[in-house]
Regions:
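Short, small-residue-biased leader/transition segments that mark boundaries at the very start
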Residues: 3-4
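A short, charged/proline- and glycine-enriched loop
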Residues: 8-18
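Short glycine-rich or small-residue beta-strand-to-loop segments that form or flank ligand, phosphate
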Residues: 16-22, 61, 91-92
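Short, glycine-/Ser/Thr-/acidic-enriched flexible segments
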Residues: 23-26, 51, 94-96, 139-141
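Short acidic, glycine/serine/threonine-rich loops at helix termini
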Residues: 30-32, 56-61, 99-108, 145-154
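Short connector loops at secondary-structure junctions
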Residues: 42-66, 137-144
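N-terminal glycine-rich phosphate/adenylate-binding segment common to multiple enzyme folds
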Residues: 62, 68-139
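Cap/lid and interdomain-hinge subdomains that line or gate substrate/regulatory clefts
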Residues: 114-172
Length: 172
């Protein structure tokens, strides 16, 4: 409770709202991402829970009939974030995540899930269509230090945020 509030209130407010789509494996890591962005002073907007209407609204952008339903639904979530007037949409491709069992093994994700942010960038093109930057960095997270190092680089290049601030946010 209090520790989290204090930490956020001490943070510089950036007046940038980051849209996070409530989709695919990205949803499983949402607690990390919401804490990460908020502790760096960003506002967060998560897309609404999935509905059939949301699915239908995104269908025009679906490039393949054979792609799975959860992937098709992503297009509707992107449109939902556009309606919520976010400043940027963040949907990383995370190529590998460390296994909970041992340090030496990694579990790989479904290729569609892994590559879907690139599909969104090309088919929906949020920047071109709605003027909303669509950030889809590719992360290779085999070990905890990969996560920290790659996020430090991404935040420094994208938002000019100091490595020490990003490091604190990763651990928040």
């Amino acid at each position: 409770g209090d520790v989290y509030k204090r930490q956020v209130s001490d943070t510089v407010r950036r007046n940038i709202t980051i849209g996070l789509p409530r989709v695919l494996a990205f949803w499983d890591t949402m607690p990390f991402w919401t804490t990460f962005w908020r502790s760096l002073g960003f506002e967060i907007q998560i897309s609404s829970p999935s509905t059939h209407k949301m699915f239908e609204e995104g269908l025009s952008a679906v490039t393949s009939d054979t792609v799975c339903f959860p992937a098709k639904l992503v297009h509707g979530h992107i449109r939902d974030l556009v309606k919520k007037k976010v400043d940027r949409i963040f949907m990383p491709s995370i190529a590998a995540i460390g296994s909970e069992n041992t340090e030496s093994t990694s579990e790989s994700m479904c290729a569609v899930v892994k590559g879907y942010p690139l599909v969104i960038r090309n088919s929906d093109s949020p920047e071109k269509q709605w003027g909303i930057p669509f950030d889809a960095p590719l992360f290779y997270w085999y070990r905890e230090e990969d996560k920290e190092r790659q996020l430090i680089t991404y935040m420094e290049q994208t938002f000019s945020i100091q490595p020490s601030e990003t490091k604190k946010a990763v651990l928040a």
